[in-house]
Amino acid sequence: MSEFTQDTVQKPIDELVTWVKQYDFSLNLPTERLAFLLAIAVLSNERFDEELGEGELHDAFAIVTRLFAESGEASAFRANNAINDLVKQRLLSRFTSEMTEGASIYRLTPLAIGITDYYVRHREFSKLKLSIQLSMVADEMAKAVESAQQGGSVAHWRKNVFGVLKYSVSEIFDRIDLNQRVMDEQQQSVKEQIADLLNKDWRDAINNCEALLSETSATLRELQDTLQAAGDELQTQILDIQECVYGDLELDFIEETLSALQMKLDRITSWGQQSIDLWIGYDRHVHKFIRTAIDMDQNRAFSQRLRQSMNDYFEQPWYLTYADAERLSDLRDETLTLRDEEVTGHVPTEVEYEELQQVNDELAQRIGDMLKVHKEQGAAIDLALVLRDYLASHPRTHHFDLARMVVDQAVRLGYSESDYRAIQPDWTAINDFGAKVQANVIDRY
């Protein structure tokens, strides 16, 4: 909230309501009317006196109407109605003088300037990165800190410190606040796009994921790289100036300004942390959607379509887009856990220097020999039953690693015909501790 708005809020609310009621203020700006008002503002800025004649307003209306083809032709009658509507809403002031021979001239009212200025700034700041704005405010704060450390008369403080803080730093803080609100709108848009993924065809959904990941990653990178560092720097600069004015009653106005800036900085950094958490959540949602896109299709239609696309490649060529991301480090130790809390006695000499990998290899060989019996007899391998029987004779702490070895050895022996029919197996329990496996019966060797 700007300082001007804060001063206004301090007035009694009933007084403001009475003022609005007394002058019958009201706004009704459809998209076409708002575009017309912005066109008038652009033309006014190009004029030295910021005054426009009726002919220029008609030209602006014609430009807007051409872009809104569905609204109808740009007739003089419709243009006059639009002009009169803006005058009635106190967005345009109409003047008639003898010098213009009865023709009216028009100027934007303060209300219209406020509205158009907001939209123009909104468009500018949506393109201006947060990092640039934070760099700008840090430079201005550095000037104020340097002047404060030099010291001087009250006039020096008002000119070189208070002036910079009040009219430069504070203004940039307000711009940052506006940029944050723009990013809030962007965040809401991304949230809606993620929700729409579930309602799209799988091809469209996967294509949208690429754009969403680019947007979320770029935003996260900007927030994380700039907010924390810039926030610490600005906080240090504010504390440096406070140290210079501490205990000096003549510089209370500097203290008040610093307090207002501190509130704005706290709001910016707090918003930044919340936004980082939100964007991390959105980024994870998109990654999760990509990981589960195939599993969500219970009939394995995705796999069928992929195989069909491979078969039809020469008749209907296509491009393959893939992401080559860095592998994430898995901190879980995949090797068997050796527990020695209650180990007593001596280790046999023949295994004292035996490596754990060698133990794993021997264990995998035993599992492979066990499964080969199914292949030799031509019997199918139901991994759920095999795992349940095999794990029952081993400690619970070894179940995960042993199950991985069994599955690894089984898929080396053969495959399941059901996989090629896009049949999805059910989840089946393999121990009494909640572990489950989803695998078709291996019946082809």
Swiss-Prot record:
One Pfam family it belongs to: KicB
Gene Ontology BP annotations: cell division; chromosome condensation; chromosome segregation; DNA replication
Localization annotation: Cytoplasm, Nucleoid
A GO term from the CC aspect: nucleoid
Gene3D superfamilies: Chromosome partition protein MukF, middle domain (1.20.58.590), MukF, C-terminal domain (1.10.225.40), Winged helix-like DNA-binding domain superfamily/Winged helix DNA-binding domain (1.10.10.10)
Region (Leucine-zipper): 213-241
Alphabetized UniProt keyword annotations: Calcium, Cell cycle, Cell division, Chromosome partition, Cytoplasm, DNA condensation
Domain of life assignment: Bacteria
InterPro entries in the record: Chromosome_partition_MukF, MukF_C, MukF_C_sf, MukF_M, MukF_M_sp, MukF_WHTH, WH-like_DNA-bd_sf, WH_DNA-bd_sf
Main localization category: cytoplasm
One Gene Ontology MF term: calcium ion binding
Family: Belongs to the MukF family.
Subunit relationships: Interacts, and probably forms a ternary complex, with MukE and MukB via its C-terminal region. The complex formation is stimulated by calcium or magnesium. It is required for an interaction between MukE and MukB.
Function: Involved in chromosome condensation, segregation and cell cycle progression. May participate in facilitating chromosome segregation by condensation DNA from both sides of a centrally located replisome during cell division. Not required for mini-F plasmid partitioning. Probably acts via its interaction with MukB and MukE. Overexpression results in anucleate cells. It has a calcium binding activity.
HAMAP family: MukF
Protein name: Chromosome partition protein MukF
Species in which this protein is naturally found: Vibrio cholerae serotype O1 (strain ATCC 39315 / El Tor Inaba N16961)
